[in-house]
């Protein structure tokens, strides 16, 4: 089982690790800072650098398709893996700019949930945009929601996480905002669920990476609102600052 360092500290950009498996799915490490695709958030990219200096690009990160609890680091198709075998010690480093964008957008989607009190019917978080689909038929105002996000960002509210028991979650079903995806239950068998809290604004199960304070979300605005169906309104978020100003 991969030790998921990002669960407790999303600000980590690198760690030392040892390869425990290499198969058709990718490279598996004993520990990692790479977040795998999940909860609507894209997987991390970055590099693995072996002790001898060999470097392997990682273009995506996923949960292992057949080994529960393991994370696979996916190299480009056809990449040479000669220097990366079981037992190789290395430094795993994520693309920090890409991760930071994921963290800002993911926290911003929780601010959306605070502003739009309806169930979530879909989610996607990338380095260039984020979107949430809300189960509702009422119209939404783009400028009003952008202003609400800006207000919560300006409030500089602390963002934290904690673990609750699965029994506690089951006793409080209103914590779950997603209609289609169930909260990530612990694969360790400990029977616990990770909960994200934005002080005074949002509290819900979430396994993603987030900033530590809403002020760090920065200039995020609503770029589009779409009526996807009679009961679905899609809200798309984007950065208001130029790409070179991010990091």
Predicted regions and their residues:
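Active-/binding-site microenvironments in catalytic and ligand-binding cores
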Residues: 1-247
């Amino acid at each position: 089982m991969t030790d998921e360092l990002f669960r407790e500290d999303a600000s980590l950009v690198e760690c030392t690790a040892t390869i425990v498996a290499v198969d058709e799915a990718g490279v598996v490490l004993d520990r990692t800072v790479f977040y795998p695709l999940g909860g609507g958030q894209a997987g991390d990219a970055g590099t693995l650098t072996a002790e001898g200096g060999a470097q392997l690009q990682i273009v995506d990160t996923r949960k292992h398709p057949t080994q529960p609890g393991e994370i696979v680091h996916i190299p480009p198709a056809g990449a040479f893996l000669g220097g990366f075998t079981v037992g190789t010690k290395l430094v795993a480093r994520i693309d920090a700019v890409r991760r930071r964008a994921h963290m800002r957008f993911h926290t911003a989607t929780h601010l959306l949930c605070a502003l739009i009190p309806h169930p979530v019917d879909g989610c996607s978080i990338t380095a260039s945009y984020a979107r949430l689909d809300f189960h509702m038929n009422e119209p939404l105002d783009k400028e009003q929601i952008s202003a609400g996000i800006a207000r919560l960002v300006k409030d500089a509210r602390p963002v934290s996480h904690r673990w609750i028991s699965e029994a506690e979650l089951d006793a409080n079903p209103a914590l779950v905002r997603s209609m289609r995806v169930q909260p990530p239950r612990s694969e360790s068998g400990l029977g616990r669920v990770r909960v994200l809290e934005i002080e005074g604004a949002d509290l819900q199960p979430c396994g993603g990476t987030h900033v530590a304070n809403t002020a760090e979300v920065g200039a995020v605005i609503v770029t589009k609102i779409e009526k996807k169906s009679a009961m679905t309104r899609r809200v798309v978020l984007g950065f208001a600052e130029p790409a070179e100003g991010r990091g």
